[in-house]
A protein has these predicted regions:
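Short beta-strands and strand-loop turn motifs
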Residues: 12, 107-110, 135
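Active-site-proximal region of nucleotide-activated glycan assembly enzymes
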Residues: 120-135
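A general structural detector for well-ordered alpha-helical segments in enzyme core domains, enriched
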Residues: 28, 94, 121-125
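Short amphipathic alpha-helix
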Residues: 22-32
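Conserved nucleotide-sugar donor-binding subdomain of glycosyltransferases
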Residues: 76-119
Length: 135
């Protein structure tokens, strides 16, 4: 079933350890695209070269993964612990993307039930989306 749709979806997924969450998010995005949604998949983990891109736009935030001390040990792509400035930069990039896309639908994978360490960007994103003028 394919239909034309003018609605857009911004789907945020953060993989920190493995890539199962981003693979499943990619499948959901493919299905949304297949029924006509304009889909932007925003990923914040290490880049994955072989994600299915047909019909969706993939936006890579500055990569983040966990260090040896567990899920509270957030590291950048050089394995350096992230600091407040790094988090502000990434949050601002995500909010800028949201403003540029102005999606009709926002999906956050796992949050607030998981990915609590991503509060620094997801709570501002949700607050920003809630404050936006809607028809």
């Amino acid at each position: 079933m394919t239909r034309s749709n003018d609605q857009s979806v911004l789907f945020h997924v953060q993989h920190l350890l493995g890539i199962g969450h981003v693979r499943r998010a990619n499948i959901v995005c493919q299905a949304l695209s297949g029924v006509g949604f304009q889909v932007i998949l925003v990923t914040g983990g290490s880049p994955i070269a072989d994600l299915q891109r047909d019909g969706i736009e993939i936006v890579q935030l500055p990569p983040l993964h966990i260090g040896d001390r567990g899920f509270h040990d957030l590291r950048d792509d050089t394995n350096t612990p992230v600091d407040a400035d790094w988090k502000v930069n990434r949050r601002d990039r995500l909010l800028d993307l949201f403003n540029a896309v102005a999606p009709d639908i926002l999906i956050t994978e796992a949050f607030p039930f998981g990915r609590r360490q991503m509060r620094f960007e997801l709570i501002p994103l949700l607050e920003h989306a809630a404050a936006r003028n809607r028809p």
